[in-house]
């Protein structure tokens, strides 16, 4: 079985503070895009191991890979003993703030759920995957969603209006734990002043996520642009001033706005036009390609379309 594992971007990311358990309380609006890895999974009765092939130098096919860990978690939870062969074809840049590894893990669990006829619901898979990482549950369904708690509690939102992003990934990564630590978010009281599992209707006013939820209700691309925000951007841009230059150039070449995705370092340029996206990408590639920066383009991808992709893959 072959499944596509799409990347995610953050349309809004607010860090509300540091909880007593050490995690940060966040409220985020996330969106999948049509930039995807491919995960091929097969049951192998000839051995009882997990065999992972593919990957990259930055994400090698070993026992520390999220795909391997996801497969092992499924086997332990479901009491399975037969072998699993997994091949991973990477397209999404690694350590880029795009959740490529998380999406690969989610695709692996979805494939094994189907292959072994486990009958797990999306919510059950999200709960299971939250044990591996905070952003993995969102990738089970994708589309446009609100993520709260430490990022593992997911609520679907109205789909974002269609748009394109130009992605510029520098030849360096950003450590998510280090970025969060450097942000210096205030300690939160215990118990929290609001529900840990916030819903769209209870998202704190004044946050980028609140503004984004309101913008999505209108279905207007311009309103979405105005609501974009990322609390982590200030940290990563301070460490790597070149990212500020990339943001300026993306808008200078034709994008409507630019924003860092997640903890970075990938910078996103937003446009409603595919032609503009391709034009900006060509200009950025000419400028930054020789310095080993990766330049990609992708459009928004809603859950229903992602499901159709994977139905086609399974035929």
From Swiss-Prot:
Hydrolase found in the keyword field: no
* Enzyme Commission number(s) from the entry: 2.7.1.148
Q: Which GO terms describe its biological process?
A: isopentenyl diphosphate biosynthetic process, methylerythritol 4-phosphate pathway; terpenoid biosynthetic process
Which InterPro entries has this protein been placed in? GHMP_kinase_C_dom, GHMP_kinase_C_sf, GHMP_kinase_N_dom, IspE, Ribosomal_Su5_D2-typ_SF, Ribsml_uS5_D2-typ_fold_subgr
What catalytic reaction does the record list? 4-CDP-2-C-methyl-D-erythritol + ATP = 4-CDP-2-C-methyl-D-erythritol 2-phosphate + ADP + H(+)
* Listed pathway(s): Isoprenoid biosynthesis; isopentenyl diphosphate biosynthesis via DXP pathway; isopentenyl diphosphate from 1-deoxy-D-xylulose 5-phosphate: step 3/6
MF term (GO), any: ATP binding
> What keywords would UniProt list here?
ATP-binding, Isoprene biosynthesis, Kinase, Nucleotide-binding, Transferase
Enzyme class, spelled out: transferase
Which HAMAP family does this chain map to?
A: IspE
Q: What does this protein do?
A: Catalyzes the phosphorylation of the position 2 hydroxy group of 4-diphosphocytidyl-2C-methyl-D-erythritol.
Q: Which family does it belong to?
A: Belongs to the GHMP kinase family. IspE subfamily.
Protein name as catalogued: 4-diphosphocytidyl-2-C-methyl-D-erythritol kinase
Show the taxonomic lineage.
Bacteria, Bacillati, Bacillota, Clostridia, Eubacteriales
């Amino acid at each position: 079985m072959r499944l596509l594992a799409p990347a995610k971007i953050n349309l809004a990311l607010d860090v509300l503070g540091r909880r007593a358990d050490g995690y940060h309380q966040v409220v985020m609006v996330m969106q999948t895009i049509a930039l995807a890895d491919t995960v091929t999974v097969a049951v192998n009765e000839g051995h009882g191991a997990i065999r992972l092939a593919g990957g990259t130098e930055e994400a090698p096919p070993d026992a520390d890979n999220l795909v391997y860990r996801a497969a092992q978690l499924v086997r332990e939870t479901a009491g399975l003993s037969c072998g699993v062969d997994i091949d991973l074809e990477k397209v999404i840049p690694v350590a880029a703030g795009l959740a490529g590894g998380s999406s690969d893990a989610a695709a692996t669990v979805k494939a094994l759920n189907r292959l072994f006829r486990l009958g797990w619901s999306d919510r059950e898979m999200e709960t299971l995957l939250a044990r591996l990482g905070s952003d993995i549950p969102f990738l089970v369904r994708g589309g446009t969603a609100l993520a709260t708690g430490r990022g593992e509690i997911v609520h679907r939102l109205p789909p974002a209006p269609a748009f394109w992003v130009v992605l510029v990934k520098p030849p360096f990564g950003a450590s998510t734990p280090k970025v969060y630590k450097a942000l210096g978010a205030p300690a939160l009281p215990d118990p929290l002043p609001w529900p840990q599992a916030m819903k769209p209707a209870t998202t704190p006013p004044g946050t980028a996520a609140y503004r984004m939820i309101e913008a999505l209700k209108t279905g207007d691309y311009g309103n979405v642009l105005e609501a974009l925000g990322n609390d982590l951007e200030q940290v990563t841009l301070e460490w790597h001033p070149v990212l500020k230059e990339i943001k300026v150039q993306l808008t200078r070449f034709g994008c409507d706005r630019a924003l860092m995705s997640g903890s970075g370092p990938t910078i996103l340029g937003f446009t409603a036009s595919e032609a503009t996206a391709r034009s900006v990408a060509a200009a950025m590639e000419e400028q930054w390609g020789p310095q080993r920066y990766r330049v990609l383009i992708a459009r928004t991808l809603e859950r229903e379309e992602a499901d159709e992709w994977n139905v086609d893959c399974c035929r």
